[in-house]
């Protein structure tokens, strides 16, 4: 953690909805005049697309059917921790971009499935924003939690997460349902051992819960809408969080536990704005004072 150069880490698996959360943060940053630098988690994958395919084939031939992008060893977590540490100490660091498709290739000049060159962060930033799979990993080799000042988890109930991933990968990446299902199965071991434990380290978790039948996500024709969902928001330490105020400001919300509130799915953005804006404002104010 760093008073001068704070770090916000948002963790969620593929299809969890972290991009929506990132958009809300960008709105807050813009409104509050916060200059941020950002890291996308896939920038720290260890392999490009071709090399990952070869590594998957090698491991499968050796009897390992669990290796995936969720796995620790498929990612440069020591390098990610080094960047977190450097930013917290100096406000400097570096990142790159993983190019997913032709549109990104046209913008970056790099073929899909490859990385851009490493590039330094812009100077004079207020904070670092990370969004990806591994921003709160604690294991025998790295401890990313100790570097992050605000840690958020985005964890829909599992069937909803699968529905969102299937629909996203079919629409944006041209995969078949069967291909996405194979990916889900291969990732399950690392999901349980590498992704899920991070949600015990986060300060706030946002869990979307559908109120329609999602019992077979592999045949679902559409993603449950916000109006067909609830959001459970859990605070690791509710001290300083005025839950009665939040429930009074958000129509249809209530406290389900002393550290949890439930809001209608179409109020997620409002809830995040109300919860996160004062936290970010205080974090940035104290950081600017410490740097002065």
Swiss-Prot record:
Q: By what name is this protein known?
A: Phosphoribulokinase 2
SUPFAM superfamilies xrefs: P-loop containing nucleoside triphosphate hydrolases (SSF52540)
The record's annotation in InterPro entries points to: P-loop_NTPase, PRK, PRK/URK
Gene3D superfamilies with a match to the protein in the record = P-loop containing nucleotide triphosphate hydrolases
Pathway this chain belongs to: Carbohydrate biosynthesis; Calvin cycle
> Which positions bind ATP?
12-20
What keywords appear on the UniProt entry?
Answer: ATP-binding, Calvin cycle, Kinase, Nucleotide-binding, Photosynthesis, Transferase
UniProt source species:
Cereibacter sphaeroides
Which gene is the coding source of this polypeptide chain?
A: prkB
């Amino acid at each position: 953690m760093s008073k001068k150069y704070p770090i916000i880490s948002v963790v969620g698996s593929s299809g969890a909805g972290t991009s929506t959360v990132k958009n809300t943060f960008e709105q807050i940053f813009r409104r509050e005049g916060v200059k941020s630098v950002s890291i996308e988690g896939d920038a720290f994958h260890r392999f490009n697309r071709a090399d990952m395919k070869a590594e998957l084939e090698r491991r499968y031939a050796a009897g390992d059917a669990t290796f995936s992008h969720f796995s620790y060893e498929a990612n440069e977590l020591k390098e990610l921790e080094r960047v977190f540490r450097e930013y917290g100490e100096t406000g400097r660091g570096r990142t790159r971009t993983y190019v997913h498709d032709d549109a990104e290739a046209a913008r970056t000049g790099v073929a899909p499935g490859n990385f851009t060159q490493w590039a330094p962060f812009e100077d004079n930033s207020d904070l670092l924003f990370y969004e990806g799979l591994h921003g709160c990993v604690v294991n025998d080799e790295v401890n990313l939690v100790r570097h992050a000042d605000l840690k958020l988890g985005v964890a829909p109930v599992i069937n909803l997460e699968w529905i969102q991933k299937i629909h996203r990968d079919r629409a944006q990446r041209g995969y078949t349902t069967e291909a996405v299902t194979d990916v889900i199965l291969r990732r399950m071991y690392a999901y349980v051992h590498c992704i899920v434990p991070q949600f015990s380290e986060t300060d706030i978790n946002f869990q979307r819960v559908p109120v329609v039948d999602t019992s077979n996500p592999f045949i679902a024709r559409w993603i449950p809408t916000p109006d067909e969902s609830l959001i459970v928001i859990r605070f690791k330490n509710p001290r300083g969080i005025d839950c009665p105020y939040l429930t009074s400001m958000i129509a249809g919300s209530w406290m389900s536990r002393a550290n949890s509130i439930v809001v209608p799915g179409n109020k997620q953005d409002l809830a995040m704005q109300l919860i996160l804006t004062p936290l970010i404002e205080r974090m940035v104010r104290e950081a600017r004072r410490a740097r002065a």
